């Protein structure tokens, strides 16, 4: 009886959370990413060096549907280390770029942010996408260049740590924020990142 009460309490708590999330996604309008364009198609057709798994293709299709809905997307992507979450994140960012928006990826540690930057930069340079790295140890001159590139739109994809939350970090047209290990960030921090857009 005690186990059943605990189970029911947890079940109804989860149901309440799900209801709130559904309500928020209906209330909060998002950008409409109506097309998959040159960046996505060029990388997929000419530069992808391994076949995507069925699960990766399915998730990318689901994300594309969410991004085209006009509602704010709040999606959790789970997988083991090395399961291909980074390539899914990269394709998702390319959809944002193909629709004229910028994207950012926030990681909880400088080591993880640097790993993402190195992996994604290698892929991005093949299709002419400009990627930046912003962490707590980024030098002042580099920060200024990053800030200028974000505001004029020449820096299309920014990867970093909590440094992305600084007030000085503003975008010309931020359309997508990807948060790695989102459980390591507070709700207020995630919301602050979502609000970063000068338009």
Language-model segments: which ranges?
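Conserved SF1/SF2 helicase motif Ia
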Residues: 74, 88-117, 125-130
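Upstream accessory/linker segments immediately N-terminal to the RecA-like ATPase cores of bacterial MutS
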Residues: 1-47
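SF2 helicase catalytic motif II
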Residues: 149, 163-199
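Conserved motor-coupling elements within RecA-like helicase/translocase cores
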Residues: 137-158, 165-174
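Conserved glycine(s) of the Walker
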Residues: 84
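Conserved pre-motif I regulatory segment
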Residues: 28-78
């Amino acid at each position: 009886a005690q186990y059943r009460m605990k189970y029911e309490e947890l079940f109804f708590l989860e149901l309440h959370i799900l209801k709130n999330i559904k309500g928020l996604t209906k209330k909060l309008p998002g950008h409409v990413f109506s097309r998959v364009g040159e960046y996505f198609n060029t990388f997929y057709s000419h530069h992808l060096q391994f076949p995507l798994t069925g699960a990766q293709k399915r998730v990318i299709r689901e994300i594309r549907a969410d991004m085209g809905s006009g509602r704010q997307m709040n999606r959790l992507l789970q997988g083991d280390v090395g399961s291909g979450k980074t390539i899914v994140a990269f394709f998702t960012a390319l959809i944002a770029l193909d629709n004229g928006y910028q994207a950012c990826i926030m990681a909880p540690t400088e080591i993880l942010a640097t790993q993402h930057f190195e992996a994604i930069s290698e892929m991005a340079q093949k299709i002419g996408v400009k990627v930046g790295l912003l962490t707590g140890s980024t030098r002042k001159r580099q920060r200024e260049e990053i800030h200028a590139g974000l505001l004029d739109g020449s820096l299309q994809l920014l990867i970093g740590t909590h440094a992305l939350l600084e007030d000085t970090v503003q975008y010309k047209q931020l359309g997508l924020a990807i948060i790695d290990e989102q459980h390591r960030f507070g709700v207020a921090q995630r919301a602050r990142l979502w609000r970063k857009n000068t338009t």
